[in-house]
């Protein structure tokens, strides 16, 4: 089934995906409902303020410190780099950065994507005849405070760049007159001298300025956003002090089982400011997160829950859970369930994946997420709800390019529990019990005709055994850099 019909079946009001003809989804006719329980709360270690950008009385009090990216940084995960291999195969890569401000109960989610970068601009008739239709370009989206939205997109990718082996990327939508667009990480002052509209992101630094391009008529938008903040990673993807892991295991080094997914920073602390429309948000040690995905296209349908702000727990807690129905490699359209739940807590990662246990879920088309999983030693259970209407977001699709394909909210009410698993499979000692009112929740793809119940119990045993083999491809291939694939 084409992505167009899949998403329309998810929401019959989504009838057009062309970027020049914005969609008109259900949320346009709904007034988001904010539960009376969802109120700002105070976190002693986080400082945040809001002011107008041009206020004379509110001086800039937060000045983030730029640190250049080092080649052997701590907590670096595999697959931090840009995976484009230079071939004309269908390909996209996307990045997601989130900053949460608990005192204001607001989040900012930055989403970047590049599509078919082998073609730096729209395909010519000859290229279409040779390679088939492709959608090209670079997109930047922000889901920000008060569920407002901003999107800037262009079909050319001449000014997009990404580091082959590190989480360093950027794009220039509009250069300062007389200046040359950067093609690598540059200090903040130089970026501001050369880039009028664009962004750059690294593990330690994130800055940019983008303007809404007017293509969105289904959500409340802001005209522009500007930001600068630094980040101190706390969790990568693995135990603190240990070698960090590939989220999807060693097969992620190869173009099979796509799309691939890598959490680059399960948790960090960010300091800086974001100008969002007419407001300025300043923050110190705000919980932050980053992830990425890449490959030929998104899953057929999927769900996702992520949270870094919790009550009732000591220390840093980070949750990432997600799953989907993805196509298996081959000539036939065969799909499998894939999912994971991972919690970083007290310096340790509690990992629940198909190759070390079973993940089960129950998802409504919108508003309810329930996931439980177990491995040899632990059991986890999470439940998330939202009364918010959510905001439709765009994602790179193979059929129609950057198009509305999912729905998100950062106001999810979440309960998370982890127990020790006893010899008979029952729950033992409670390791973690916590809750949040700032979970990010998402559903995507389709069709979503009703509740989706699924699990990973049918994961082939051969695949489970293969994924448990402790292959360190990053180190092995690093001995011969010529053979090390891009991104790894």
Swiss-Prot record:
Catalysed reaction, written as an equation: delta-tocopherol = 2-methyl-6-phytyl-1,4-benzene-1,4-diol; gamma-tocopherol = 2,3-dimethyl-6-phytylbenzene-1,4-diol; delta-tocotrienol = 6-geranylgeranyl-2-methylbenzene-1,4-diol; gamma-tocotrienol = 6-geranylgeranyl-2,3-dimethylbenzene-1,4-diol
Top-level taxonomic group: Eukaryota
Gene Ontology MF annotations: isomerase activity; tocopherol cyclase activity
Transit peptide per record: 1-76
GO-annotated cellular components: chloroplast; chloroplast envelope; chloroplast inner membrane; chloroplast thylakoid; plasma membrane; plastoglobule
GO biological process: chlorophyll metabolic process; fatty acid metabolic process; phloem sucrose loading; regulation of defense response; response to high light intensity; response to oxidative stress; response to temperature stimulus; vitamin E biosynthetic process
EC number: 5.5.1.24
Subcellular location: Plastid, Chloroplast, Plastoglobule
PANTHER family for this protein: PTHR35309, TOCOPHEROL CYCLASE, CHLOROPLASTIC (PTHR35309:SF2)
Function, in words: Involved in the synthesis of both tocopherols and tocotrienols (vitamin E), which presumably protect photosynthetic complexes from oxidative stress. Catalyzes the conversion of 2-methyl-6-phytyl-1,4-hydroquinone and 2,3-dimethyl-5-phytyl-1,4-hydroquinone (DMPQ) to delta- and gamma-tocopherol respectively. Also converts 2,3-dimethyl-5-geranylgeranyl-1,4-hydroquinone (DMGQ) to gamma-tocotrienol.
Name this protein carries in UniProt: Tocopherol cyclase, chloroplastic
């Amino acid at each position: 089934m084409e992505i167009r019909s899949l998403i329309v079946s998810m929401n019959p009001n989504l009838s057009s995906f062309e970027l020049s003809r914005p969609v008109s989804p259900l949320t346009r006719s709904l007034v988001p409902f904010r539960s009376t329980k969802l109120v700002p709360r105070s976190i002693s270690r986080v400082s945040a303020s809001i002011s107008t950008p041009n206020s004379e009385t509110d001086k800039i009090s937060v000045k983030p410190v730029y640190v250049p990216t080092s080649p052997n940084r701590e907590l670096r995960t595999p697959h931090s780099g840009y995976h484009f291999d230079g071939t004309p195969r269908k390909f996209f890569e996307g990045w997601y950065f989130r900053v949460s401000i608990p005192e204001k109960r607001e989040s900012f989610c930055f989403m970047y994507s590049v599509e078919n970068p082998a073609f730096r601009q729209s395909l010519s008739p000859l290229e279409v005849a040779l390679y088939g239709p492709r959608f090209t370009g670079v997109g930047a989206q922000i889901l920000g405070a008060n569920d407002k939205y901003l999107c800037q997109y262009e079909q050319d990718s001449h000014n997009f760049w990404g580091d082959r082996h590190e989480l360093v990327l950027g794009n220039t939508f509009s250069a300062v007159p007389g200046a040359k667009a950067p093609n690598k990480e540059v200090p903040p002052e130089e970026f501001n001298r050369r880039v009028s509209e664009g962004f750059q992101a690294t593990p330690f630094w994130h800055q940019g300025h983008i303007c809404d391009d007017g293509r969105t008529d289904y959500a409340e938008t802001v005209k522009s956003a500007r930001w600068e903040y630094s980040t101190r990673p706390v969790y990568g993807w693995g135990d603190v002090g240990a070698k960090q892991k590939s989220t999807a295991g060693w097969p992620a080094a190869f173009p099979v089982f796509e799309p691939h997914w890598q959490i680059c920073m399960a948790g960090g602390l960010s300091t800086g400011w974001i100008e969002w429309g007419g407001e300025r948000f300043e923050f110190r040690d705000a919980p932050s997160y980053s992830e990425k995905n890449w490959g030929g296209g998104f899953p057929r349908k999927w769900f996702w829950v992520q949270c870094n702000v919790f009550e009732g727990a000591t220390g840093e807690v980070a949750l990432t859970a997600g799953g989907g129905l993805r196509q298996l490699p081959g000539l036939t359209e065969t799909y499998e369930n894939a999912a994971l739940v991972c919690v970083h807590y007290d310096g340790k990662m509690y990992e629940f994946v198909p190759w070390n246990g079973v993940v089960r879920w129950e998802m409504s088309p919108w508003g309810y997420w329930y996931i439980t999983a177990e491995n040899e030693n632990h059991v986890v259970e999470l439940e998330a709800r939202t009364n918010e209407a959510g905001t439709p977001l765009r994602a790179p699709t193979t059929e129609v390019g950057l198009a509305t394909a999912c729905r998100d909210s950062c106001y999810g009410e979440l309960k998370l529990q982890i127990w020790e698993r006893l010899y008979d499979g029952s729950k033992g000692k409670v390791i973690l019990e916590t809750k949040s009112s700032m979970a990010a929740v998402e559903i995507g793809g389709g069709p979503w005709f009703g509740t989706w119940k699924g699990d990973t119990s049918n994961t082939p045993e051969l695949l489970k055994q293969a994924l448990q083999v402790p292959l360190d491809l990053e180190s092995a291939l690093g001995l011969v850099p010529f053979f090390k694939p891009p991104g790894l």
